[in-house]
Amino acid sequence: MSSPSTFSRRSLLATGAGAVAATGLATPANAAAETPFRARKVNRPKRKPNLLVILGDDLGWADLSAYGSPDIKTPHLDRLAASGVRFTDAYSASSVCSPTRFGLYTGRYPGRLAGGLPEPIASPNKLHGIPLDHPTLASLLKEQGYSTALFGKWHCGFLPWYSPTRVGWDEFFGNFSGGIDYFSKFSHNGAYDLYEDEVEVEDLRYYTEIVTEKAVDFIERDHQDPWLLNLNFTTPHWPWEGPDDRDVSDELTARLKDGESGVLFHRDGGSLATYKTMVEDLDQSIGQVVRALERTGQLRDTVVFFASDNGGERFSNVWPFTGAKSGLNEGGIRVPTILSWPGTLPGRQVSDEPAVTTDWTATFLELAGATPAQDYPLDGTSLVPLLFGGRPRETQDLFWRMRGQRALRRGSLKYLQLDGTDHLYDLSEDVREQADLARKRPEDLAELRAAWERIDETLLAYS
């Protein structure tokens, strides 16, 4: 058995294989386990696919049974993984939520925009949001005839300056802030935060239930054109409330209204049991959405993507990695990621291709036949040639910065700077980032550090 400090790539590829083997879209329960991804040419339908882009919030890499969770059972996400490709080396664009969403919506490093600098956006500010003239995934797809919707967490700028419906989404239902109480819908700063487009609405049911209902209703419409649905759950972000925890919500909301600060960060509450309930409810909700695709005959016309917006928080499981949300160790940025397109993309595959949020933006644009705006070049690189064209991908530099931390991955090597100290790790042998090779391989360290600095020079400086 591998020791913790030398948990191998082979072990990662095997993680969760048995879990997904038990279920599958239109496959028998005893179907074969997943196999390593093999680049092959795949015939894609001429019709532009629908795009269902689902985000969990603060979900740890090993919080799904498809990724080896021993306690949390996620049969619907396991089934989704079994129907397509499960990625072991996929990353978020940041280790916190709003910068990752900037990366997803623009296909560019979060640091190219002022709104990507707060890490994350904590309060309304006219400087912090996606500029109204900046192209987005939604606006570029609208040019290709797509209808577009975003349900759930936005977190890319507050009213009165910013809104999804001003930058490409036809409709929006959700919250503008980084986190809200699941029942009362109050945000951590004491403001009520549930909107339809730009109009405040009242619905005191469990938030995950509401967002799921909206998604199902959208899918069940009589669509004449292809569509993009960004489905941004807040689960399992704080506060720690499951569907039956209205009493917890009442207590937290009362304290919030009394003026107590930091209430919704919920540092005096939560448990592993509550967290398990939240993740399993998220899984059941995604199952409802996928069943709506099946029921309406749209499943084979729809690319379904699932990931977390960053690494796990307090009660999450990021094994075998170290670190968590807000940090650039693997546990803060490596996220569970699934891509499914039944009938087009062969299923039961597991890939160790390194990819980051902005790469998925480029991928979705290419699948939709959209062209990035020349004045706003993408930083992401499409995976379409690899996934559907049978062409191996050139090694990419994956870049992060976060509150004085630095990270860059090239192949299996990772440059990491924490507290002003440079580190170098070989992730093919040391995913826990324990064996620092900085002194043994100074030339590699210098090369990756220089690559990081070249990218950083093109970004906005922190204020």
Which residue stretches match the model-derived regions?
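Short Gly/Pro-enriched turn/cap motifs at secondary-structure boundaries
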Residues: A93, I130, K325-E330, L398-F399, ...
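Short, surface-exposed beta-strand/loop micro-motifs that present aromatic residues
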Residues: F218, G404-L416
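C-terminal region of N-terminal signal peptides and the immediate post-cleavage residues
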Residues: T23-T35
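Residue-level detector of anion-binding/catalytic polar loops
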Residues: R86, S147, K414
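Glycine-rich, acidic and aromatic/proline-enriched surface loops and short helix-turn segments
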Residues: R101, T106-G111, F233-H237, N310
